[in-house]
Amino acid sequence: MEMKKSGLGTTAIHAGTLKNLYGTLAMPIYQTSTFIFDSAEQGGRRFALEEAGYIYTRLGNPTTTVLENKIAALEEGEAGIAMSSGMGAISSTLWTVLKAGDHVVTDKTLYGCTFALMNHGLTRFGVEVTFVDTSNLEEVKNAMKKNTRVVYLETPANPNLKIVDLEALSKIAHTNPNTLVIVDNTFATPYMQKPLKLGVDIVVHSATKYLNGHGDVIAGLVVTRQELADQIRFVGLKDMTGAVLGPQEAYYIIRGLKTFEIRMERHCKNARTIVDFLNKHPKVEKVYYPGLETHPGYEIAKKQMKDFGAMISFELKGGFEAGKTLLNNLKLCSLAVSLGDTETLIQHPASMTHSPYTKEEREVAGITDGLVRLSVGLENVEDIIADLEQGLEKI
């Protein structure tokens, strides 16, 4: 079903649906490991890719196909691939496009496990990795080499919400025709930002977050052009990682996407109100949010994003000790990692999600010991603020 001319909410609900034998409104969960062939000849044709059809759920499943079609439509890309986690999506993609002797340019500020993969994983297998500030385009330009195969980044970045000009960066990266630009779009989602429309080659997601939105699934997604998607599916996913998403989990995300647009509207609206509260609070030292005019990436965010998101990071006067006091005294906000859930989540990046960094690496990346990260949920905003207020009073 072609939905590219429809609104985002309509696309999230209707795109990629498959007709099934019984005409069910909800997508069936095809809970099977393998699929029966009509004949030996048909099995041979499918393995030879001469005939479309399912073989084995690691290679594809009807429930998962619907999810893949939906994310491709939402990102306005040619093809999607579902994986068992965000790290599965990132790893499968990188193991497909990289080989020993290749070079990667990436940002100093990344999700902790992505940083560990770049800093300790890829380098074990002969891939050179250079860390730069990708918001500084001169640094990107100076880091590029003849063997640069990938430029990888997040925008907004986790956890300090740094913004990168995707269109300008893609133009620099593509001066080398062999370089692929890969962007983690988890924080922005296709509700706010569509990197493929700005020159990016591959988009990755932790679908655990806003796309599912209910905190009950671990999943990853990749969107790119068809040729690359086929390579990632049949090399990175099939042979290198085996990070296959089960049909049950795919179903949960398909269901979550039915409310995707209205959830994102509420997330962002709540966040704007909370930013205003935090920015005026006497115990808050600094607020990091791309919707603030004082944010260094504000103009770029305004240009390439529809809204500014629902992730807020802030530093308290009193540093980490003040942060611990706040975290330990909240009653409504949940002290938990992850993000994009219906519940408001709060955590301490330096000791939690970004603990793979050394203290020195965190300082270079702008992840201070006093930084607190807030994922704004869907509760009534006055209740979230009241909880933050009473927690801040304890400092």
From Swiss-Prot:
- PROSITE patterns noted in UniProt: CYS_MET_METAB_PP
Which UniProt keywords are given for this protein, alphabetically ordered? Lyase, Pyridoxal phosphate
User: Does the entry annotate any disulfide bonds, and if so which pairs?
Assistant: none
Tell me where on the tree of life, at the top rank, the source sits.
Answer: Bacteria
Q: Which cofactor names does the annotation list? A: pyridoxal 5'-phosphate
Q: Which residues form a coiled coil?
A: none
Could you give a single Gene Ontology term from the biological process aspect?
transsulfuration
GO MF annotation terms:
carbon-sulfur lyase activity; homocysteine desulfhydrase activity; L-cysteine desulfhydrase activity; methionine gamma-lyase activity; pyridoxal phosphate binding
Q: What InterPro entries would the database entry show? A: Cys/Met-Metab_PyrdxlP-dep_enz, Cys_met_metab_PP, L-Met_gamma_lys, PyrdxlP-dep_Trfase, PyrdxlP-dep_Trfase_major, PyrdxlP-dep_Trfase_small
Q: Which residues bind pyridoxal 5'-phosphate?
A: Y56, T57, R58, G86, M87, S206, A207, T208
EC?
A: 4.4.1.11, 4.4.1.2, 4.4.1.28
- The residues listed in the UniProt record as binding substrate, with positions renumbered to this chain, are Y111, R373
GO CC annotations, alphabetized? cytoplasm
**PTM sites of type N6-(pyridoxal phosphate)lysine:** K209
List, alphabetically, the Pfam families matched: Cys_Met_Meta_PP
Instruction: Spell out the subunit comment.
Output: Homotetramer.
Checking PANTHER family in the record gives: CYSTATHIONINE GAMMA-LYASE, TRANS-SULFURATION ENZYME FAMILY MEMBER
NCBIfam families recorded:
met_gam_lyase (TIGR01328), PRK06234.1 (NF004876)
State the similarity comment.
Belongs to the trans-sulfuration enzymes family. L-methionine gamma-lyase subfamily.
Function, as annotated = Catalyzes the alpha,gamma-elimination of L-methionine to produce methanethiol, 2-oxobutanoate and ammonia, and that of L-homocysteine. Can also use L-cysteine as substrate, catalyzing its alpha,beta-elimination; this activity seems to only minimally contribute to the production of hydrogen sulfide (H2S) by F.nucleatum in the oral cavity, which is toxic for a large variety of cells in periodontal regions.
Query: What name does the UniProt record give this protein?
Result: L-methionine gamma-lyase
Q: Which organism is it from?
A: Fusobacterium nucleatum subsp. nucleatum (strain ATCC 25586 / DSM 15643 / BCRC 10681 / CIP 101130 / JCM 8532 / KCTC 2640 / LMG 13131 / VPI 4355)
Q: What is the lineage of its organism?
A: Bacteria, Fusobacteriati, Fusobacteriota, Fusobacteriia, Fusobacteriales
